[in-house]
Amino acid sequence: MSKLEGKVAVVTGASKGIGAAIAKALAKDGAAVVVNYASSKAGADAVVEAITAAGGKAIAVQADVSQAVQARGLVEAAVQQFGRLDVLVNNSGVYEFAAIEEVTEEHYRRIFDVNVLGVLLATQAASKHLGEGGSIINISSVVTDVLMPTSAVYSGTKGALNAISGVLANELAPRKIRVNVVSPGYVVTEGTHTAGIAGSEMEAGLVAQTPLGRSGQPDDIAGVVAFLASDDARWVTGEVINASGGVR
């Protein structure tokens, strides 16, 4: 029997990159997966198609999780389609860097709304349906430890996420719901290609600082998330796990 057979997972921001890899990994382990997207319907549909072609179950649901009504609608769609909810992966995130002289109110609010408020709202909605053995996994970043110039706002969101996750781990523990964090290091995704990082001197520098000597891949993160979603991690809660090739 697959590790997640009979379970239902919602993965936010799952139309590409790390989120897409997580959705596919959970489905491979037997979960029915709700592939959330904010705007990239084609990407989400492609993830669903890949999952169903491999014999899994998945649907795509559009929602901006920084909006309470939409976050609730996402969770309700999962329960309506599959009858339950067992796993929430808060992967949606915005990463934009700016020097302190260039930070604006709009920049700050946009990033905090998705990276922090979105996690709170999705978790609030999901917590009403998660039962004993439920698992919440929040995707953070090693920028909370590796203090990069121009990342003040982004790093601030991930520091807040780590703190919130610790609080929620204690708050939801009486209900036997686990809350953990996965903090990726540098991972090659569509976003790093769009930003011009992949194949650049910056990427070479990041790899040089990585003890395992290579860039991360989305599947490197997905495997850790799949473990935390499963009953193999039943005694693990309140943890921040760096999946960074040794960067800390």
UniProtKB/Swiss-Prot annotation:
Q: Which UniProt keywords apply?
A: Oxidoreductase
Q: Which residues form the active site?
A: 154
Q: Where does substrate bind?
A: 141
GO molecular function terms attached to this record: oxidoreductase activity
- Pfam families, per the entry: adh_short_C2
Keyword Phosphoprotein in the entry? The reply is no
Q: What is its EC number?
A: 1.-.-.-
Entry's family note: Belongs to the short-chain dehydrogenases/reductases (SDR) family.
* The name this protein goes by in its record: Uncharacterized oxidoreductase MexAM1_META1p0182
Which organism is this protein's natural source? Methylorubrum extorquens (strain ATCC 14718 / DSM 1338 / JCM 2805 / NCIMB 9133 / AM1)
